[in-house]
Amino acid sequence: MKHLNIYIMLLGFSIFTGATFNLAKYTVGYFSPSSSAAWRFGLAAAVMLIILIFTEGIKKSQLRKNAVSYIVLGIIGIFGFNALFFVGLKYTSPVNGALIMGLNPLLTAILARIILKDNMTKKQVLGIFFAFIGVLLVITQGSIETIKTLSISGGDLIIFTGNVCWALYGVLGRRFVKDGTPLSTTTYTMVIGAVSLIVVSLFTSKPVSLSNIPIGVWGAIAFMAFFTSVLGYLWWNQGIKEIGASKTSLFFNLVPVVTMIISFAVGTPIKVFQVIGAVLVILGVLTASGVIRIPKYNTKEQSAI
């Protein structure tokens, strides 16, 4: 099969990212959310910076031109997203978190329409509808009474807000970064985000005796730093280069499935509404991306919005 190695890499990305929800839930049992995120991205940023130096090198003109954009993106997309991600996982399940994040490709499409004036096709609108129903099912736990009383988990709302930050990171990066490569943009924003997380952690986290932290927690942090944040990113961008962004983005929607399987394997019960929600989210993104085709009655698809 052509590009088999790329598909294997992207499957690895999905597995790494899916595992991250469970690992993050584990680490916040020992570290504060800000400390967990600071350790993860401090390590990842250092590795990414080394990779950048030995591949593309530090280009001062590019750095000066995009300095403000890198700072804003680092604060929104790395600091904002991950601070909310780790805090949210203290109050909701890894499965719910992954399912809510599964809405990201469609949320990005909405923000791209608003900020970049990108057109949205009919299949994208239909896909957004499916995914919205799926996420609504998850955060209301399948209860109509929850909708009536607006008694939605605070953790779910925090994760969703983090999702907005991550979507803004991609859209604003397209809008404001000039002449920056994916590697350089991600490295610089990751450094800004890591520094922000470390500073916040120093002022908000209670002192923890590192000698009392189980080796498994350090292993979880190392996994998230090196596999999810470094390898996952490199493989993701290799996929975009080889098979294109649209096909590559489909692998993000395996993440909730992986998280659900891992949660089930470690003894977490999976509820029917979570399974249905996962199916609807995946169905929505597959519809929006064109993998599931909508019958056409004319030869040219029209923009819906």
UniProtKB/Swiss-Prot annotation:
Residues 15-140, 164-290 form the EamA domain. It is a multi-pass membrane protein. Keywords: Cell membrane, Membrane, Repeat, Transmembrane, Transmembrane helix, Transport. SUPFAM superfamilies: Multidrug resistance efflux transporter EmrE. The chain crosses the membrane at residues 4-24, 38-58, 67-87, 95-115, 125-145, 152-172, 183-203, 215-235, 250-270, 272-292. It is found in: Cell membrane. Belongs to the EamA transporter family. This is Uncharacterized transporter YyaM. It comes from Bacillus subtilis (strain 168).
